[in-house]
Design a protein with these regions (language model features):
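N-terminal hydrophobic or amphipathic helices and topogenic motifs
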Residues: 2, 6-63, 67-69, 75-78, ...
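Solvent-exposed coil/turn segments that connect beta secondary-structure elements
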Residues: 44, 86-89, 113-115, 131-132, ...
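Pocket-flanking alpha-helical
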Residues: 50, 65-97, 161-163, 179-186
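Signal peptide-directed extracytoplasmic domains
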Residues: 86-115
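Pocket-lining segment of extracytoplasmic ligand-binding domains
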Residues: 88, 125, 136-226
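A bilobed periplasmic-binding-protein/Venus flytrap-type ligand-binding module shared by bacterial periplasmic
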Residues: 105-119, 129-131, 198-242
Length: 267
């Protein structure tokens, strides 16, 4: 009788291999916990999608070729949300495409009661919205290199706008939306408050994020050139309240959502 080699038999080894392969397939496939929502971004909005995915547990994102491709896949049910430029969403709607709701994401803006940058001096008190090193701070620092100014501090948007109204600040910079109610109120209540354009010296400078693009904003009859990030967060409609809240929360935590909650949607 021939001696058997030590170890598992061939059949047993094959059986174990099949079991392991099945477990691996299940872990990668249908038995995995589903994402809260999937966001498909145009290439220009990819940095925003990445920031949202990092901020929202269970949120996934992928990159499409362009705005039209992202919105096409959204309407065909391949994802729950699309993150595209505002112009891309508008073009899609004008062509008869249905995307709803459409939320404004954060834009970089400068509100000043001290006139344009050339009028700023060492007495100009500047507030940057957010924290040092936060989203938008790099742009704010580039703006400040173009202006002569005095002191700089960081605060949240409400406090910054209140400082403008009280006269304890002369300029506010940061990722804010000029159409927000607080900004509209400040523009109405603060004498000589202006929504400034990006300094000409920055127009040709590569700003920190490739997704930043020149964009015209209108507010109260005023038109200002500023730089907009990302544009519009759209959904095709077949989205649960929980998914909607999750993606809005992720956008807010990533610092890119100017409309703070579902339902507060721009027309």
């Amino acid at each position: 009788m021939k001696g058997r080699k030590g170890g598992l038999s061939v059949k047993l080894r094959r059986g174990l291999a099949l079991v392991l392969a099945l477990l691996l397939a299940l872990s990668l496939g249908g038995c995995a916990a589903p994402a809260d929502a999937a966001v498909l971004c145009s290439a220009e909005a990819a940095p925003a999608g990445r920031a949202m995915a990092e901020a929202g547990a269970g949120l996934s994102y992928a990159v499409a070729e362009d705005d039209a491709a992202a919105l096409q896949q959204l309407t065909s049910g391949q994802c729950e949300f699309a993150l595209v430029t505002e112009s891309g969403a508008q073009t899609w709607q004008e062509a008869g495409g249905a995307v709803s709701p459409e939320a404004a994401l954060a834009v970089f803006a400068v509100l000043s009661r001290a006139g344009d940058y050339g009028a700023w001096d060492r007495n100009t008190r500047v507030v940057i919205v957010g924290e040092a090193g936060g989203f938008g701070d790099s742009l704010a620092q580039q703006v400040l290199t173009c202006a002569l100014y005095g002191s700089v501090r960081y605060d949240d948007l409400d406090a910054a706008l209140s400082a403008l109204e009280r006269g304890t600040a002369d300029a506010v910079l940061g990722m804010i939306a000029p159409q927000d109610e607080g900004v509209s109120r400040a523009l109405g209540r603060v004498r000589n408050l202006e929504l400034l354009s990006m300094p000409e010296s920055l127009i040709a400078v590569r700003v920190p994020d490739e997704a930043v693009r020149e964009h015209a904003l209108e507010l109260g009859g005023q038109t200002a050139q500023t730089y907009a990030l990302f544009g519009a967060l759209c959904t095709g409609g077949a989205v649960s309240t929980a998914q909607e809240e999750a993606v809005y929360r992720a956008a807010q935590e990533a610092g890119i959502l100017s409309v703070g909650a579902p339902g507060a949607i721009l027309e």
